[in-house]
């Protein structure tokens, strides 16, 4: 089977780290062992510096929505061109913590940025490049933020309003319903049930790829 790019998406507190472990375990069970991990924003030296700016901001200066969006795409193109595409070319599988769907949901939905701008930027930066499979972990903003707060101090984006995350989730769900490559998993359930659902979804998808 050819190498694939699998992305895990969801709101803060959706359980992406646990999901990654479940995905890797299932891939290994199917004999896939050459796997690399990526995260967005980040994943290269430049992208990691941009991650810090995006998540923490700069003291005394407001980060505009447009600046945030452009930094995200700058980090993304560095990761895609310098890490993800080379890994796929050599036959490795890539499991990513977030990708472009996050921008479509957070900036397009949460921030309410212009859809035309979002699509133009996506096309200019990524072209036709897209994940082979996206696993969207769906949680309500209330549950997600409760889990995120339990982890400790919140970053700049995690401190956004409940309405922001409600809009973000609505955009996630709308995008998922319109794209068969995005599989939605109910992540409000107990961990064991979420893990089982992820593994079942991934197994079925892998069988379809053969």
Swiss-Prot record:
Task: Spell out the GO cellular component terms annotated for this protein, sorted alphabetically and separated by semicolons.
Answer: cytosol
GO terms (BP aspect): dTDP biosynthetic process; dTTP biosynthetic process; dUDP biosynthetic process
Q: Which reaction does it catalyse?
A: dTMP + ATP = dTDP + ADP
**Residue ranges the record marks as coiled coil:** none
Q: What InterPro entries does its record include?
A: P-loop_NTPase, Thymidylate_kin-like_dom, Thymidylate_kin_CS, Thymidylate_kinase
**Pfam families tied to this protein:** Thymidylate_kin (PF02223)
Q: What job does this protein perform?
A: Phosphorylation of dTMP to form dTDP in both de novo and salvage pathways of dTTP synthesis.
List the protein's name.
Answer: Thymidylate kinase
Specify the species: Erwinia tasmaniensis (strain DSM 17950 / CFBP 7177 / CIP 109463 / NCPPB 4357 / Et1/99)
Q: Which gene encodes it?
A: tmk
């Amino acid at each position: 089977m050819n190498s694939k790019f699998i992305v895990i998406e969801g709101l803060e507190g959706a359980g992406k780290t646990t999901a990654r472990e479940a995905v890797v375990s299932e891939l290994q069970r199917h004999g896939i062992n050459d796997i690399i991990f990526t995260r967005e924003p980040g994943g290269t030296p430049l992208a990691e510096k941009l991650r810090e700016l995006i998540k923490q901001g700069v003291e005394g200066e407001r980060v505009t929505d447009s600046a945030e969006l452009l930094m995200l795409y700058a980090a993304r193109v560095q990761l895609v061109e310098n890490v993800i595409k080379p890994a796929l070319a050599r036959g490795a599988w890539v499991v990513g913590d977030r990708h472009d769907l996050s921008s479509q949901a957070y900036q397009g939905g949460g921030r309410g940025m212009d859809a035309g701008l979002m699509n133009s930027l996506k096309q200019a930066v990524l072209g036709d490049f897209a994940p082979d499979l996206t696993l969207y972990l769906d949680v309500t903003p209330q549950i997600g933020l409760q889990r995120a707060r339990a982890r400790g101090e919140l970053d700049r984006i995690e401190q956004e309003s409940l309405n922001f995350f409600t809009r973000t989730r609505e955009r996630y769900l709308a995008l998922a319903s319109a794209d068969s490559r995005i599989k939605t998993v109910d992540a409000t359930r107990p961990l064991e049930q979420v893990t089982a659902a992820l593994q079942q979804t991934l197994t079925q998808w892998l069988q379809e790829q053969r």
